[in-house]
């Protein structure tokens, strides 16, 4: 809706929301929109879908979650075969694929051979229309 900015604050395991004034480019004070338990890992990268729902990557918890931010409600969880999930973004000609990035190190490749892969899922929704930068 271009009126709310979401910020993932990994160290505090929270998502903060700021009212955003598009005309003036200013932010209101932050409020905690979601606070995660330790079992949820660290929230990391995120993206919005065309319905305005927030998709969040969970570092250390092997999952992506989808949230209704208006209601503050978890809608869906997608499990992944690797723990270090870093971010997600919609792509493809119709923006109907969700690409999920993961991380690896030498220790993670033996127990998790797919660590470091980019996964593609079709979540049944699309990404938002692309916003073009006017330049300047």
Please provide the spans of the model-predicted regions.
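Blade-level signature of beta-propeller repeat domains, shared across WD40, Kelch, NHL, RCC1
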Residues: 89-136
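Beta-rich, blade/repeat-based domains predominating
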Residues: 1-5, 36-53, 82-97, 105
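Beta-rich catalytic cores
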Residues: 11, 29, 42, 60, ...
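Conserved beta-strand positions in repeat-built beta-propeller and related beta-rich domains
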Residues: 5-12, 54-59, 97-106, 111
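Surface loop/turn motifs at the tips and blade-to-blade linkers of beta-strand repeat domains
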Residues: 32-39, 77-81, 135
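Flexible "stalk/tail and boundary" regions
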Residues: 65-76, 90, 98
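Structural signal for beta-propeller blades
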Residues: 13-16, 62-64, 106-108, 118
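Short loop/turn segments immediately following beta-strands, especially the blade-tip
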Residues: 18-26, 69-71, 122-128
């Amino acid at each position: 809706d271009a009126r709310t900015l979401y910020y993932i604050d990994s160290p505090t395991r929270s998502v903060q929301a700021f009212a955003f004034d598009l005309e003036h480019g200013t932010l209101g004070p932050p409020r905690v929109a979601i606070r995660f338990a330790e079992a949820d890992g660290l929230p990391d990268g995120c993206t919005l879908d065309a319905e305005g729902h927030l998709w969040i990557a969970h570092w250390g918890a092997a999952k992506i979650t989808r949230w209704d931010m208006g209601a503050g409600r978890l809608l869906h969880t997608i499990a992944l075969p690797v723990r270090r999930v870093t971010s997600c973004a919609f792509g493809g000609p119709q923006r109907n694929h969700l690409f999920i990035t993961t991380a690896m190190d030498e220790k993670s490749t033996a127990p998790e051979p797919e660590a470091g892969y980019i996964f593609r899922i079709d979540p049944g929704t699309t990404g938002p229309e692309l916003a073009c930068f006017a330049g300047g």
